[in-house]
């Protein structure tokens, strides 16, 4: 029987300004370990709102989120930050690399925050991730010296540095051309197939979504598939 990495149970979300409005309606689903899941739907359907709840960055919701068999809703902000750093890797539309640091240091940052490895161990792991993603030759460069596709590969390496249970992405190919979008998709596919990495990716790219293992379609705050 497959192990569930992430579960949402009867999740509801409201916005209150200017009037009370339900954004997410009674969402329940689970994601099995080692699956590549895409979330699709029109703008405003609640995709990114759901992702922020699942990633523990939004705690103002009804229902329950279970990550690695831990119930998250009653945990405080410090506990959630620790869980987020240890168990979730993030890849966004924008890379959010720090220009003052070189590529290697950027990849190491979540590991430095976690504090489980020595600097030498962390450097070695960061370099291995960059090598796997084909950008190890850029390790000592600053982000502004990289192409858009290279920056996104570096951000994926950063997401992997703490060996997370799940990688969550919000439009990770949104700023990329077709060639680089395909490269990023291939990286995700390989991570899932070879390393049993669990992926949950919000995307507008239906071609990207169709090639993943599973598609969750959202409409007006509800799950259709």
Name the predicted role of every residue range:
Residues 4-6, 11-211, 215:
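ABC family nucleotide-binding domain
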Residues 215-225:
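H-loop (His-switch) and adjacent beta-strand-loop-beta switch element
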């Amino acid at each position: 029987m497959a192990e569930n990495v992430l579960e949402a149970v009867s999740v509801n979300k409201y916005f209150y300004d200017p009037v009370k409005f339900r954004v997410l309606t009674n969402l329940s689903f689970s994601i099995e370990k080692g699956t590549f899941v895409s979330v699709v739907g029109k703008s405003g359907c609640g995709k990114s709102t759901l992702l922020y709840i699942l990633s523990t960055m939004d705690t103002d919701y009804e229902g329950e989120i279970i990550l690695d068999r831990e119930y998250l809703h009653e945990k405080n902000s410090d506990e959630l930050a620790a869980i987020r750093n240890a168990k979730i890797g993030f890849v966004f539309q924008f890379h959010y690399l720090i220009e003052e640091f070189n590529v290697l240091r950027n990849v190491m940052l979540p590991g430095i925050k976690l504090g489980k490895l020595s600097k030498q161990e962390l450097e070695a792991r960061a370099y291995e991730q960059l090598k796997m993603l084909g950008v190890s030759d850029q390790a000592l460069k600053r982000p502004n010296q990289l192409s858009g596709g290279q920056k996104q590969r570096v951000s994926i390496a950063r997401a992997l540095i703490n060996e997370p249970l799940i990688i969550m992405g919000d439009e990770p190919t949104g700023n990329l051309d077709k060639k680089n979008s395909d490269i990023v998709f291939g990286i995700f596919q390989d991570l899932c197939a070879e390393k049993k990495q669990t992926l949950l990716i919000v995307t507008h790219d239906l071609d990207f979504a169709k090639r993943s293992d599973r598609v969750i379609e959202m409409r007006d705050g509800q799950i259709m598939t």
